[in-house]
Amino acid sequence: IYHDRNAGRLSFNEYDALRLDGKRLIPKGSNIMTDGSIYVLEDDPFTEVVLHGTKADIWFEVKTSDGRTLRYGDTENSRQTVSPSSGSKFVNAWYISRMEDSNGNFMTYSYLHENLTLYPQTISYGKNLHTQNGADNTVNFIYENRPDKCPYIVKDVQGSMSKRLRSIETKTGDALYRHLELSYSMDPGSGASRLSRVQVWKNSDSRQ
């Protein structure tokens, strides 16, 4: 309301407001949702967001005030793409796919897609743009079906949050460093999944 002077609904077009991690993007200039459009965060004018591409291939490059460069949706895997019953498919959300610091260290992200929902699947780190050396480190997220699915609608397409996190593994190459196992109970009042236990394994040790 503060920026738009109204509380209108989503139109799923170029005039909808854009947000980065919940913060409103403010256009610099009159160009919006076109290749090369520039935005800033509403509470951080020193973080610049540049739009690249067109239509279903749009992605965003974020340059932060502390020297990091982040990419959102520059891979097909990191986009929530919706195919409505009428009209063209469109991207509803762009997820982080890469982060690089000012020294060239970088991380990449990949996602599991199911029922319109994206779940973080692998985070890879330990490499540097300026050297050929570096560790091949990964954090892997493993999911299971949840009995308390959470349905939702994007335009006329139904999605569902149907997975919950079962375990997390951290590795260097093929060597397992740590494994976390999550257990759940069901809330007797709401019927919702409730985290009840986390077990951690490192080498042959375990603890609760």
Residue ranges, per PLM feature:
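Conserved catalytic cores of ATP-dependent inositol ring kinases
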Residues: I1-Q208
